[in-house]
Structures are given as structure tokens and as C-alpha cells.
Amino acid sequence: MSWQTYVDDHLCCEIDGQHLTSAAILGHDGRVWVQSPNFPQFKPEEIAGIIKDFDEPGHLAPTGLFLGGTKYMVIQGEPGVVIRGKKGTGGITIKKTGMPLILGIYDEPMTPGQCNLVVERLGDYLVEQGF
């Protein structure tokens, strides 16, 4: 299965009639493995900040999580494994696996719980597959 299939069929799939606005799979080095067409252009330092928060949970809490110039307020996740952010009616979920980061961005009417489910389910599957 190609990485594009994971984004198209597993991240951008429909859940209760809703779907993510954009999604991507990145290496821990910030390189894009695959992304949806509308995934925001991000800066290397934004990914570096995300990786640092996985290594040092709470690092992003004072400043917020930035991706593509958009600032998300960091909300409770799973230290070292999942980072969740909120901005207005939308947000972001990032799951760290052994090799890639799985990122999902949503907006209403999708809920944070639906985004978490989609992103974390794929991340758990990839961990089981050795990624």
C-alpha cells in the first residue's frame, strides 16, 4: 500500500459524514512522506518545535503549536505520543510513531474526538506494522 493511500483512504476518509480538512505523514526529520493537496506549507522550525514537545512534553504549552503559520493552543494529549491543538472551531492532532508523524487538521462540523480517532487509529496501526 502506498503512503498516499494512507492519507486518502485512512486519514481523509469519512467519519459520521465528516472528514479532516487536511492531513499529512511526515518523517521525524520534517520531510513530507505524503500530504493532502491542501495541507498547509510549514516551516522546518515548526516541525522542530513539535518534535521537541514529543521529547520534552509541555515545551509548546507556553507559546502554542504553530503549523503553516497558524497558532494552535496546546490541549491535553498523551505525553511523548500525541499532541492535540485547538484553534477556534477547529484543531489538530499529531501522533508520533517509531518513524513518521501522523498529522490531521479539522474544522467544524468534525469534532476533536473524530479527528483524534482517525489520526490515532492510523498511528496505532502503523506502530503495529513496525513503523
UniProtKB/Swiss-Prot annotation:
Compartments (UniProt record): Cytoplasm, Cytoskeleton
Protein name listed in UniProt: Profilin-1
CDD domains given in the database record: PROF
Top-level taxon in the UniProt lineage: Eukaryota
Keywords: Actin-binding, Cytoplasm, Cytoskeleton
An example molecular function term from Gene Ontology annotations: actin monomer binding
Annotated function: Binds to actin and affects the structure of the cytoskeleton. At high concentrations, profilin prevents the polymerization of actin, whereas it enhances it at low concentrations. By binding to PIP2, it inhibits the formation of IP3 and DG.
Similarity comment text for this entry: Belongs to the profilin family.
Pfam families found in the cross-reference section: Profilin (PF00235)
GO cellular component: cell cortex; cytoskeleton
Complex and partners: Occurs in many kinds of cells as a complex with monomeric actin in a 1:1 ratio.
